[in-house]
Amino acid sequence: FFIDSSRCTGCKTCELACKDYKDLTPDVSFRRIYEYAGGDWQEDNGVWHQNVFAYYLSISCNHCEDPACTKVCPSGAMHKRDDGFVVVNEEVCIGCRYCHMACPYGAPQYNAAKGHMTKCDGCYDRVAEGK
């Protein structure tokens, strides 16, 4: 999933598209948008000028080369596919949350209603179709 962060306005449409495609509940977000903003006002001969900025970062599972989440999963549910996507087999997952604790990006999320972990799967089905 490529995002040109220099063009990102923080509209969260990518986050909503993910939630819609995966039919996620309001409390679950596989993609999150972070904002970093700052700046100040400066006076120049009685005229005030703004010097403000905002940057946005769209974060999801990074499908790491050497994922920490897969190393701590006792059931083997969290695994890396041959195509590089890190996914959770929800039928095998025991919901121990070790993967969540190990992931530096907070990608695996516990779904209390399902009783197991869920996470971004990189839309590997769409990627396989060339979408």
Q: At which residue positions do the language-model features occur?
A:
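Non-ligating segments of multi-cofactor redox enzymes
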Residues: 1-131
